[in-house]
């Protein structure tokens, strides 16, 4: 390449560089101008938007200010109205207070006037009382001089006459009241009791716990006794029951205080006889199984009893105790059957009286629950039963009805009285209960002794198996009106001192005979 070409190349490069620079300058200036114009437009638009937003904010602020002003005006008017109402009420109260003050002032004035009048009358009465006391003293002195009696003697004589007259009038009043009450109560009670007895269809058969076990042959007695008596001793030790083997053919008698033990012994002995294997180890095993089976049976019996009566929600332990009542008797009456009968009678009578039938049945079913454990726990069975009912969550009215059905505590509710009536009705019906001859004779003697111990009684006779006592009185000592008082006193004393099933009728007879002789 020659020098000229190099020079031309350099010149061309310089011209190109200058041209490029100029073009770059022109383009940069153009871009800067466009950027300035864009910035001006953006600034203008931002200014316009700011002005528009400012106007909008101002308008919104004015609206809020207007709303707040209107709200404040409304609140002001409401408060002003409320203040006016309060002011009016305050004015009315002030007027009423002023009126009351005027009345109080008037009453105070009247009270002062009355007090002055009372003071004047009191002074007058004091003077008259002194005068009257003086006159009474003078009259007493004159009466003592005339009658020859002191004031104390005269007072005692007057009190005696007033007492006799009062007792006479009280007897007449009691006779009228009792007659009316008996007429009304007797009709209602007879209707309710008759309805209950007619609607209840229970068994009227006395049940007794069986204590005799039949044997297939006389040889079985020897096997039960065992070598040197070891089998019978093992059976008695395991069950707590005495086995009596005597000359009675093919029979073993079981004797024990606890009916449950007697039942376990009966079940075990029957199973041993049926099995044929009788030795001490086998006896202990069978007795243990019989105890478990009886436990299950007791619950089943209790559940069946609650189902038959229609009572639900009873604690499982109470159900078990109900089952134990199957093996408990009272005057030869089965206690479980008696409790179910009382529950049914309570339900029927409660329905007739408009009471809660279910609660009445519940109280009737549980009223003798204490008899299930009364041989293990000291105290009256009614109190024991109430404690058990309380322990297992029964309500207060049920607990009270149980505790009061023999009046160990006074009955304070209609339910308690209803259970008493049903209990008496179940126990007093013919054939329901029996008692020992010695107890029967002693009860009759005690009954006659109470009547004979009353003043004015000449003779007393217990009749109808002790369910009625007839009392003959001396007509010279007891009049017709006093007869009613005497009858009531005898009834109360019998209720207080004797224990008896059902009711005892007290009849007082006053007879006056006039005998003349024609000559």
From Swiss-Prot:
What keywords were assigned to this record? Answer: Cell membrane, Endonuclease, Hydrolase, Membrane, Nuclease, RNA-binding, Transmembrane, Transmembrane helix
Q: Locate the KH domain: which residues?
A: 209-272
Coiled coil, from the record:
none
List the EC numbers from the record.
3.1.-.-
GO CC, sorted alphabetically, is:
plasma membrane
Q: What does this protein do?
A: Endoribonuclease that initiates mRNA decay.
What's the protein called, per UniProt?
Answer: Ribonuclease Y
- Provide the species name: Oleidesulfovibrio alaskensis (strain ATCC BAA-1058 / DSM 17464 / G20) (Desulfovibrio alaskensis)
Taxonomically, what lineage is the organism? Bacteria, Pseudomonadati, Thermodesulfobacteriota, Desulfovibrionia, Desulfovibrionales
């Amino acid at each position: 390449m020659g020098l000229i070409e190099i020079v031309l190349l350099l010149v061309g490069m310089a011209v190109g560089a200058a041209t490029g620079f100029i073009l770059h300058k022109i383009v940069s200036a153009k871009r800067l101008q466009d950027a300035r114009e864009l910035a001006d437009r953006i600034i203008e638009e931002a200014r316009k938007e700011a002005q528009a937003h400012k106007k909008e904010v101002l308008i919104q602020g004015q609206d809020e200010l207007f709303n707040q002003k209107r709200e404040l005006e409304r609140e002001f008017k409401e408060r002003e109205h409320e203040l006016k109402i309060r002011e009016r009420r305050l004015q009315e109260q002030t007027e009423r207070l002023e009126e009351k003050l005027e009345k109080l002032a008037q009453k105070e004035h009247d009270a002062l006037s009355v007090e002055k009048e009372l003071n004047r009358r009191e002074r007058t009465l004091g003077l008259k009382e002194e005068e009257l006391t003086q006159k009474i003293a003078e009259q007493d002195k004159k009466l003592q001089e005339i009658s020859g009696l002191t004031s104390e003697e005269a007072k005692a004589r007057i009190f005696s006459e007033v007492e006799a007259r009062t007792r006479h009038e009280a007897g007449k009043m009691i006779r009228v009241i009792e007659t009316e009450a008996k007429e009304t109560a007797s009709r209602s009670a007879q209707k309710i009791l008759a309805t209950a007895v007619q609607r209840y269809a229970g068994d009227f058969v006395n049940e007794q716990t069986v204590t005799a076990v039949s044997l297939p042959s006389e040889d079985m007695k020897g096997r039960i006794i065992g070598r040197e008596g070891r089998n019978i001793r093992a059976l008695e030790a395991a069950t707590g029951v005495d086995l009596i083997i005597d000359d009675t053919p093919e029979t073993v008698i079981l004797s024990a205080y606890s009916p449950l033990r007697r039942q376990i012994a009966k079940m075990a002995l029957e199973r041993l006889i049926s099995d044929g294997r009788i030795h001490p180890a086998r006896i202990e095993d069978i007795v243990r199984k019989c105890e478990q089976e009886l436990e299950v049976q007791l619950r089943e019996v209790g559940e069946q009893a609650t189902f038959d009566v229609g009572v639900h929600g009873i604690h499982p332990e109470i159900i078990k105790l109900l089952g134990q009542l199957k093996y408990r008797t009272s005057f030869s009456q089965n206690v479980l059957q008696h409790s179910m009968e009382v529950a049914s009678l309570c339900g029927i009578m409660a329905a007739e009286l408009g009471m809660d039938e279910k609660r009445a049945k519940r109280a009737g079913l549980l009223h003798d629950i204490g008899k299930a454990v009364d041989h293990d726990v000291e105290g009256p069975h009614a109190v024991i039963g109430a404690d058990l009912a309380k322990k297992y969550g029964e309500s207060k009215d049920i607990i009270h009805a149980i505790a009061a059905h023999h009046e160990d505590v006074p009955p304070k509710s209609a339910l308690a009285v209803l259970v008493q009536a049903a209990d008496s009705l179940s126990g007093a019906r013919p054939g329901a209960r029996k008692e020992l001859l010695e107890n029967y004779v002693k009860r009759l003697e005690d009954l006659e002794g109470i009547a004979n111990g009353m003043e004015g009684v000449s003779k007393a006779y217990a009749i109808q198996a002790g369910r009625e006592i007839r009392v003959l009185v001396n007509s010279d000592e007891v009049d017709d009106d006093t007869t009613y008082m005497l009858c009531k006193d005898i009834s109360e004393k019998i209720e207080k001192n004797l224990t008896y099933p059902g009711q005892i009728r007290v009849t007082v007879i006053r007879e006056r005979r006039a005998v003349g002789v024609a000559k």
